[in-house]
Amino acid sequence: MCIRDRCTVTILSMIGLFNIAGTLTSGYLAQKLSKKLILSTIYLARGLVIAIFIFLPPSPIIAVGFGIAFGFLWLSTVPPTMGLVGFIFGTKYIGLLYGIVFLSHQVGSFLGAYLGGVFHDLYGSYDYAWYISIALSIFAGLIHLPIIEKQVPRIQTT
């Protein structure tokens, strides 16, 4: 596809650079708009970006474009997720609650990497891992829509 080392470094650099921009942008938007809609949009956009990437013919420009787009979307879920969890459940146990969110994220990361390798070993391609990523992105985008952005009642202690 391209000179591997140079192209890989460029893609990783774009992911890192645009990750900053995406996180700052989503944090700003989370102060102004519905957090569940921001999250839904981000997850659906991830699925779209992955679909575009795997269905276009491979080239260095496509790979760098994917790095830019996916970098922008990569950790942009963190600010609205933190804001939503903090708003709904309050901040008293925010560390524990976000720890649970982050743990589930890490389990998903492990499964994505591991199953990608399993699919490659079984089928000689990562295609099925990409297809599942698209489906899970769509699922994540849709599952956020019914979230009710309302604080849960607090138990008063004396």
Label the predicted regions.
Residues C7, S13-N19, T25, K32-L84:
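C-terminal transmembrane helical hairpin of 12-TM major facilitator-type secondary transporters
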Residues L29-A30, L115-G124:
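Interfacial helix-cap and linker-helix signal at transmembrane-aqueous boundaries
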Residues T23-G27, A113, H144:
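Conserved kink/hinge residues within transmembrane alpha-helices of Major Facilitator Superfamily
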